C-alpha cells in the first residue's frame, strides 16, 4: 500500500516525454499508469515529442529488442504495418490539445491511441481514424488539431519546452520519465521496470521520501 501524498508532496510532477507511435513509449506508458494510480496527486505532463514525421519506419530489430526487454509481444495487426512510414503528427496535435485543455483525459487518451496503433494496427493519419477514440472519451477537439500536414501551434510550442528539458537532462532519447519535486529533477530509468511495472511505485516513493523530508 502506497502512503498518500501530503499537501507538500502534491507539488510533485511527472513528465513523460514520448511519441505515441514509438514502441518503447508504448511499453513505458504502463509505468505512467502505475504511477498515476498510486499517486493521483502527482501532476502529469504528457509531452508528445512528435518524433515520427512520416519519413521513417520502425525496424523489426527494434521491435524484437522491445519485446525482449519488456517480455511482451506486438500484435500481428501492428507488425504488418511496420514497413510503412510512421507519422504521429495528428496524435501529437491531439495529445497536446488534451494536455492543455482536458488534462484529466490526457492519460486515457494516450492509452486509447496506443491501443489503436499497437494492438489494432491503425496508422492514425486521418481524422476519421480517431473517431471511435474521440467518441468513447466524449472529447470535442477543434478542427485545427486534425491538419495532417503540420504540427499545431500548441504542439510546436510544446516541442520547444521538450527541447529545453532535454538540454537539462542531457539526452534527447525518448521515452523519458522525469519526476520533479520542488527544485529537484529525477530521471527515472524506465528500462528497470518494464517487466514489473508496479516496482516503479517503490522507486517513486523513495524519491518522495528523500526530497520531501
Model-derived segments and spans:
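A short beta-strand-turn-helix
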Residues: 1-12, 159
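C-terminal cap of thioredoxin/glutaredoxin-like
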Residues: 18-21, 28-36, 115-213
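Short active-site neighborhood of thiol/selenol oxidoreductases, capturing the structured segment around
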Residues: 8-23, 28-32, 44-45
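Structural alpha/beta surface segment adjacent to cysteine/selenocysteine redox centers
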Residues: 26-121
Amino acid at each position: 500500500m502506497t502512503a498518500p501524498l501530503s499537501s507538500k508532496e502534491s507539488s510533485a510532477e511527472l513528465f513523460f516525454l514520448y511519441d505515441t507511435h514509438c514502441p518503447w513509449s508504448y511499453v513505458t506508458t504502463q509505468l505512467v499508469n502505475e504511477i498515476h494510480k498510486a499517486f493521483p496527486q502527482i501532476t502529469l505532463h504528457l509531452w508528445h515529442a512528435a518524433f515520427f514525421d512520416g519519413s521513417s519506419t520502425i525496424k523489426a530489430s527494434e521491435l524484437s529488442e522491445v519485446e525482449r526487454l519488456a517480455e511482451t509481444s506486438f500484435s500481428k495487426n501492428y507488425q504488418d504495418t511496420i514497413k510503412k512510414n510512421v507519422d504521429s503528427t495528428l496524435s501529437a496535435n491531439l495529445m497536446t490539445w488534451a494536455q492543455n485543455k482536458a488534462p484529466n483525459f490526457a492519460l486515457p487518451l494516450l492509452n486509447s491511441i496506443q491501443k489503436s496503433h499497437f494492438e489494432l494496427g491503425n496508422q492514425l493519419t486521418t481524422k476519421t481514424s480517431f473517431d471511435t477514440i474521440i467518441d468513447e472519451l466524449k472529447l470535442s477537439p477543434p478542427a485545427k488539431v486534425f491538419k495532417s500536414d503540420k504540427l499545431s501551434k500548441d504542439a510546436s510550442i510544446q516541442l520547444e519546452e521538450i527541447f529545453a528539458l532535454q538540454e537539462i537532462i542531457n539526452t534527447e532519447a525518448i521515452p523519458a520519465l522525469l519526476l520533479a519535486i520542488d527544485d529537484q529533477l529525477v530521471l527515472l530509468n524506465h528500462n528497470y521496470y518494464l517487466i514489473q511495472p508496479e516496482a516503479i511505485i517503490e522507486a517513486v516513493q523513495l524519491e518522495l521520501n528523500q526530497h520531501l523530508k
